[in-house]
Structure formats: C-alpha cells, structure tokens
Amino acid sequence: MTKSHLLKYLLTSPNLPVGGFCYSEGMESYLHNKNLNDSNSVKELIISELKIGQIRLDAKLLLDFFDIFNEINDGKNAKSNLQKLLSLNKWILSSKDSIEMREQQTQMAKSLFDLTKEFGFEYLYENNKKSSWPLAWSWACFCFEITKIEMVENFFYAWSANQLSAALRIIPIGSTKTQLIQRDLLAIISKVSKEIMDKQIDDIYFGNVGLAMAQQNHNDLYTKLFRN
C-alpha cells in the first residue's frame, strides 16, 4: 500500500485535519421548516447537493488548482499561474452566500495548511491571505501525490461525512442509520466524481437557492459547530 494511499485517510477522517470541527451548514433551517425529519430526508438532501449543489463547483476547482500547482512546480508560466490561482481562490470564496460559510472555508483551509506544513509542505503562495477549502484540499492532495480522481472522490466523501455527523447531532438519526446512508452515498459519489472530471468549469450547473436561504436564515451558523 503506497504512502499516498494511506495519507488520503488523513483528509477523509471526520476528526482530522480540520480540528474536529463539524459544521451544520444551515441544516437547522431545514429542520425548523420540517423538511428534515428522518434519515431518508437527510439522505435526499445530501444526494441533491451532490447532484446539483455548489459542492460540485468546489470539486471542479480542486482540479483547476491541482493543474496550476503542477505547472508552477514544473516552472511553467509561474506569474500567470499564480495570478490565476489567487483569482480562482477569491472567486470561489465570494461565491459563498453567507459570511459564516466564508469563515468556515477559511478556518478549515487554515487547519489543513497547518497540517501539510507539519508534513514538510508549507504553502507559500499568498498564505497570509484568506484561502478557500478547495484550495487547501487540492494543495494537500498535490503534496501527498494523491490522484485527481481520488482527490475529488475523497472531497465528496469527507463533505458528506461532515453533513451526516452534523445531522446525527441535530435530528438525531442514529449512528447505524448514518453509516447506512454513507454506504448508500458511495455510488453517487463515484458517479458525480467521474462527471466532474470530464467537465469544464463553465459546464458545471448548480442550483443552491434553498441552501443559501437556509444558511442565511440561520443567523449564526458558527454556533452550530460541533466538536468531536
């Protein structure tokens, strides 16, 4: 088993590398509106986000960031690639519909950059600026030599695991049902990951009006941050 194969488990762990944080991402609003009341509704919500949610755009950015890191590492178009890197990072952060979501992104990114630094891979590209979670995830996968398809699959898996962990605390739905949902999500994660690999960024459709409203209705999302 290769080192990169083992290192990817650091990224998909529900406790690492983001400090044991578990963000609810507006689930309380769905719960308050009675749109989220059992394991089936939780599963349907996560599947919907995987199919048409903004998380798809985040996943696509992973690939763009990864390609940029490769080119910079090869000494190709360093200046223009760095500008593109910063521009895409700023763009994906600004696409988040609430301050809390942007703060979540930057907190998680900082934690992951801290981890990769401990492994000997310090991020040197404007690290004093606010960085997005996709940027940090892509950097970690680039450093750990994880393949692009595994990078995307692991990203979706970790995100869905975080959502299920939050749902387990909010509803609750029970740990056994949570594990069953995660199992059932594997096929859709694999399918969506392959779709993302074959698409250009302009081809990524997402509709997250409901999620945006849920997050904005939940005035202080950061208070719903659970520590494991």
From Swiss-Prot:
Gene Ontology CC terms, in alphabetical order: cytoplasm
The UniProt record lists the keyword Cytoplasm: yes
- Report the Pfam families cross-referenced here: UreF
Where's it mainly located?
cytoplasm
Q: Which keywords describe this protein according to UniProt?
A: Chaperone, Cytoplasm, Nickel insertion
Under Gene Ontology molecular function, one entry of this record is:
nickel cation binding
Q: How does it assemble?
A: UreD, UreF and UreG form a complex that acts as a GTP-hydrolysis-dependent molecular chaperone, activating the urease apoprotein by helping to assemble the nickel containing metallocenter of UreC. The UreE protein probably delivers the nickel.
Q: What's this chain's function?
A: Required for maturation of urease via the functional incorporation of the urease nickel metallocenter.
Q: Which HAMAP family match?
A: UreF
Q: Return the protein name.
A: Urease accessory protein UreF
Coding gene?
ureF
